[in-house]
Amino acid sequence: MQQQVKSIFTECIQTQIAAADLLQDAVMHAAELLVNTLLNGGKVFCCGERMAHASARHFAHIMLTGLDFERPPFAVTALHADFGAREHEYTFAQQILPSGQTGDLLIVLNASATAPRVCRAMEAALSRGMLIVALTSEADQQVAGLLGPEDVEIRIPSRNSARVSELLLQLVNMLCSLSEQQIFPQELDE
């Protein structure tokens, strides 16, 4: 069992090193979109399929309450997975359609091969003129295909659902931290 534990830690570290090498530009571009949306008075919506839903909710929470220091809340809403849509696949989309608009941003998280609710949310966001940041994995077969030229994909270099979930959490923390640092640079000096 000791070797198994060491093997899991090694795999975690290797995945993080690969992500650090591959994802820097995409993360910076996503953070810029997020900051620009917030500074221009836009709203940010986020959602995730299955295990990624918890990371989406966490992202909304830290964007509202602050991660690295106390600050005013950012306009971020986690879309509810249990919202009573007539068709389960449209749960997230039905929450975007009434209030999403040009200048808003949708952040989607997906750790699996398919993501019907996330895909319908993306279609709704695109129909409303919104931009999209997608945090995906190598297993993704749907989400990346819906992205436009101005959207951003952060594709985690793994198919292992545990490693992907770990990096999703790390990435949403990073996006929040980068946003805080850009919007409130004076807090870094204190």
Give a label for each model feature:
Residues 53-57, 114-121:
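Short glycine/serine/threonine-rich phosphate/pyrophosphate-binding segments
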Residues 44-45, 129-132:
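Hydrophobic beta-strand scaffold residues
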Residues 1-21:
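Generic N-terminal amphipathic, Lys/Arg-enriched alpha-helix
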Residues 136-188:
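Short alpha-helices
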Residues 33-100:
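Glycine-rich, small/polar surface segments that engage phosphate groups of diverse ligands
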Residues 122-129:
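Surface-exposed amphipathic alpha-helices with a cationic face
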Residues 49, 81, 111, 137-138:
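Cofactor-binding loop segments of dinucleotide-utilizing enzymes, especially the Rossmann-like FAD-
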Residues 43-47, 102-113:
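A short, small-residue-rich loop immediately preceding and capping a beta-strand
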